[in-house]
Amino acid sequence: MKDIKVTDSVKYIGVDDHDIDLFESQYVVPNGVSYNSYVILDEKVAVMDTVDARKTDEWLANLEEALDGRSVDYIVVSHMEPDHAASLQVLAEKYPEAQVVGNAKTFNMIPQFFTFDLEGRKVVVKEGDTLSLGSHTLQFVMAPMVHWPEVMVAYETSEKILFSADGFGKFGALDADEDWACEARRYYFNICGKYGVQVQNLLKKAAGLDIEIICPLHGPILKENLGYYIGLYDTWSKYEPENEGILIAYASIHGNTAAAAKKLAEILEAKGAPRSEERR
């Protein structure tokens, strides 16, 4: 298991996938991707999401190491997409006493993916509901279409952790040495980009929470300078530019259009355009 610390009571049990060629069968991920999952160890134990079926065995080994002989009381399902929920049935059958936590839409979707019996095991939550684990309490915030209709996030009130589902995610395995913003930007616009209104709704809800740690389902755990990450999400979801300027995009077979584009850039700069950039 990766030695990644969230807090003393919250353990990272996710896995990296360097074997994947295309994320969701369409997005190139040269540095792989991480499937993040977490476990909260308190009087009650809660597993926060599962992982893709490609990595079930490795993930279960991580979970068992973190549990150190304990059992699971709650399985929290924030997102039903298979890269986060594919191992749900395996986990539910391994710990048959564990209750499954989700919203009404979650439980409408589970039978479409799995065959295990949910009778007597459902904890249905809605906006603002809480779940006490002992000294830790989860507060649930609905985040529909960020980026599936059943998505919800959870805020742990004692350690001020936001389990943000696909929000604040990033392409790239956790051992990738790369800038956060570049691959987070590409992830955002491919996965959540058309749901700007819904992301704005979530950001407004998050503004009322005292967040010190963000635990996404892809990419690194965020502990410092959270205003930077939240600010980028605010900009992206408003479809505003990160930097003021003018993009001149062109294709030029014989070089004439290129010359015209460069001349246009010179004119714009002379008129005080803050920045111009050529793209061929």
Language-model segments: what does each one mean?
Residues 3-65, 153-156, 160-164, 246, ...:
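Conserved beta-strand hairpin/beta-sheet module of binuclear metal-dependent hydrolase folds
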Residues 4-8, 102-224:
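Metallo-beta-lactamase
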Residues 43, 54-101:
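Active-site metal-binding motif and surrounding structural segment of the metallo-beta-lactamase
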Residues 48-50, 72-80, 100-103, 162-165, ...:
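Active-site neighborhood of phospho(di)ester-bond hydrolases with catalytic His/Asp-centered motifs
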Residues 215-242:
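Short N-terminal or domain-adjacent regulatory/targeting segments
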Residues 261-275:
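Short helix-loop-beta junction
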Residues 278-279:
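Conserved small/polar residues in nucleotide/adenosyl-binding loops
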